[in-house]
Amino acid sequence: MGNSDSLKAVWFRRDFRLHDHTALKHAIEAIEKHGGKWLAFFYLDPKTASVEPVHHDYFFQTVMQFKQMLKTNGGDLYIITGTIEGALSKLLQAFPEIDAVYANDDRVGDGRLRDEAAEHFLAKQSIPFYTFEDAYLTEPDQVLKKDGTPYKVFTPYYKAWAKERKRTPAVIKRDVLLGSVHKGTAPDREAETLFNNLIKKCSYDWSAIGEEHAIKRLQMFTKKRLSGYKANRDFPSITGTSRLSPYIKTGAVSSRSIYYHILNAEADSYSAETFLKELAWRDFYRMVHFYEPDCKDREIMEGYRELNWSHDQDDLTSWKRGETGFPIVDAGMRQLLNEGWMHNRLRMITASFLTKDLLIDWRLGERYFERMLIDYDPSSNIGGWQWAASVGTDAVPYFRIFNPVTQSKRFDENGTYIRTYIPELNHVPDHYIHEPWKMSEEEQVKYKCRLDEDYPLPIVDHSKQRKKALSFFKGDDEE
């Protein structure tokens, strides 16, 4: 017999949507069978609230947009904070009718520890805590080698991943969803105030956020850009990528919805496969993170754990500010500063420059990207940095060192991208745009760009640094 007074509490984390939401689907199905209502809540970790990276601006604005959307539909997103035990206790005190908590799981990093603590606390209250795999297309321990061990190389992983049947999007009955949403009094006024203050302190303002915009962008990309994705995705001056990553980060759209939307699209099959392979890379790096839980702080390749990386603050600051004297590197870093996002080709170029040209510790780069990227995904970011630094799983060989000038000429031939983010070089002609240091003094005056005044000279000599990097990784550097 059903209990019409019971409440199902759905814990939203990085899944701010009402469609294709696995935990929400199960909560609604329970309500259909047994009656009751559901409420939504968000746990604001005090550690998260105490720092103000750019990606938090985007994330918290998404949370606020979702909260407002729920209010429009008769509900609310309740904010709780404090220790996880204390926060959940407040929630249960405010809503004693709660008889189950539902969430999409977090199986890596701090989220894993938080969920273990939450499960332990709720068990003491005799309240079941149901968690579901949702954020990825495959579970981290699903695609393994025949001997049950994780893959170390992406290509064979991808072949196995491609054969795996992917979960289809979760269908949620909209009438039941909106008809059973609960509206009550906020359980934690302190948390609501803390959250509102975080919103007020946001230094960046994003308008195209949330579920509705995510779906529109997916549809637009599929219709207008997918067919040219394979050919255009590496050129930053072309709008050739999906720009879906911030929406994936916040869960405004699910990877399942994207996967099946692309799979069923009438587009070039090679471009579609190339795009889907990026989703496989996301699953791959999450799998690596699952089996290498210390990879944020430690190289996966044991042979490189004792490298004597540089921590030169002047070089690091030049890199962060986009003042290295290498236009393609600086354009990428300035895009990151201005937009909280960077084209993927530039992520590789800038990471290679930091670790191979400056020989600066990859962890410093990873931490900076963590602070700045609005699409920051721990597993993918760590994996990408260890790849660039040649110290991770299936990493680029240490002797493959990106030449920033060659990369610039190949992927931004006419300097369109460079000029977008480095106005000092607007008048510099194409034949100097990649190497402005080759201009004579007369040409610098003519093109309104005086080196070391308007735009910096290169902070390193790439050819010399390449030789130094090779020695560094071989272990025969003298420093």
UniProtKB/Swiss-Prot annotation:
Pfam families: DNA_photolyase, FAD_binding_7
Marked site (Electron transfer via tryptophanyl radical) residue numbers: W309, W362, W385
UniProt cofactor(s): FAD; (6R)-5,10-methylene-5,6,7,8-tetrahydrofolate
Region Interaction with DNA: start-end pairs: 278-285, 344-345
GO molecular function terms attached to this record: deoxyribodipyrimidine photo-lyase activity; DNA binding; FAD binding
Name of the protein this chain belongs to: Deoxyribodipyrimidine photo-lyase
Chemical reaction(s) catalysed: cyclobutadipyrimidine (in DNA) = 2 pyrimidine residues (in DNA)
Residue runs in coiled coils: none
UniProt entry tagged with the keyword DNA-binding: yes
Keywords per UniProt: Chromophore, DNA damage, DNA repair, DNA-binding, FAD, Flavoprotein, Lyase
Role: Involved in repair of UV radiation-induced DNA damage. Catalyzes the light-dependent monomerization (300-600 nm) of cyclobutyl pyrimidine dimers (in cis-syn configuration), which are formed between adjacent bases on the same DNA strand upon exposure to ultraviolet radiation.
Residue positions binding FAD: 229, 241-245, 278-285, 375-377
InterPro entries for the chain: Crypto/Photolyase_FAD-like_sf (IPR036134), Crypto/Photolyase_N_sf (IPR036155), Cryptochr/Photolyase_FAD-bd (IPR005101), Cryptochrome/DNA_photolyase_1 (IPR002081), DNA_photolyase_1_CS_C (IPR018394), DNA_photolyase_N (IPR006050), Rossmann-like_a/b/a_fold (IPR014729)
EC number: 4.1.99.3
